[in-house]
Amino acid sequence: MDRVLVASYPINHLIRPHSFRIDYCWSTCFTSRLNSGKERQKLSSRWRWRSMASDSTDSSSSSSFAPSVESDPSDKTSASFCIIEGPETVQDFAKMELQEIQENIRSRRNKIFLHMEEVRRLRIQQRIKNAELGISKEERENELPNFPSFIPFLPPLSSENLKLYYVTCYSLIAGIILFGGLLAPTLELKLGLGGTSYEDFIRSVHLPMQLSQVDPIVASFSGGAVGVISALMVVEVNNVKQQEHKRCKYCLGTGYLACARCSNTGALVLIEPVSTLNGEHQPLSLPKTERCQNCSGSGKVMCPTCLCTGMAMASEHDPRIDPFD
């Protein structure tokens, strides 16, 4: 009976003190339940859990980084585990158990979508602040990586400046051909330099004879430079094509679509009925506008295809990266 009183003390304070009948019935039922061994084990485990919870709450008050008692133990294991810590260290997860793998997948998937939602809201606030500050020039947001140019003194590669690369490439090739085919032979003829090693070959293919006076070093330099520049241009074009394939087809890499409710203006025109009194003609008042509730005044809404990322692949279930294909 002493055990009953000690065990029932912290629970009786939740019941109103004047309800003696409820206390008596509860103590009677509690005494009968103590007779079974299974219920006694459940009770001891319950009290042990409460003591551990009280200890953990005390420790969490002293340290701000201590985990809460109500958190799932799977979150603790997933938080302490990291498959890729950095570009240098990659941990092997082949020895993990199935339950542990599922917990880590669930935890990381939730974190990914939480970060994507935070990015979406931050972008909306950024557009709202730009509209409030009167910044009308909107730069096209593109988070795809910029490929550095292989050709010196040229800006990073993108689909916008691809024409600049074509003009630069063709200009360099034309300049090298003019230098090796016309300028260098003319200078060598005037200076009395050059050799006759190519004379028979030039005569056999019916080319101008002044090409036979070209120095072999100049000829090899011109041909090699043209080949290298052509190869680099092919690499640049392939990078542009790969960048376009990674971009979302609907929003073109911006992550946003035009709001259909406000027609990309960010404001709605309030239409009020016009009433006339006694047939008098009065000038109409200016229409009133309010901020669009659909896009919060930004004029843009989230692209549902890429989930505001601008990338064509927004899910881990993409058939292009299927490891079992």
Swiss-Prot record:
CXXCXGXG motif repeat extents: 248-255, 292-299
Transmembrane segments: 164-184, 217-237
Major localization listed first in the record, in broad terms: plastid
CXXCXXXG motif repeats: from-to residues: 259-266, 303-310
UniProt keyword list: Chloroplast, Membrane, Plastid, Repeat, Transit peptide, Transmembrane, Transmembrane helix
Name assigned to this protein: Protein ORANGE-GREEN, chloroplastic
Disulfide bonds: none
Region: Disordered, residue numbers: 53-77
PANTHER family (UniProt xref): OS02G0651300 PROTEIN (PTHR15852:SF24), PLASTID TRANSCRIPTIONALLY ACTIVE PROTEIN (PTHR15852)
Compartment(s) where it occurs, according to its Swiss-Prot or TrEMBL record: Plastid, Chloroplast membrane
Keyword Coiled coil attached: no
Miscellaneous comment in the UniProt entry for this protein: Its sequence is related to the DnaJ family but lacks the J domain. The CR-type-like region is similar to CR-type zinc-fingers.
Positions of the UniProt region annotated as CR-type-like: 226-317
Species lineage: Eukaryota, Viridiplantae, Streptophyta, Embryophyta, Tracheophyta
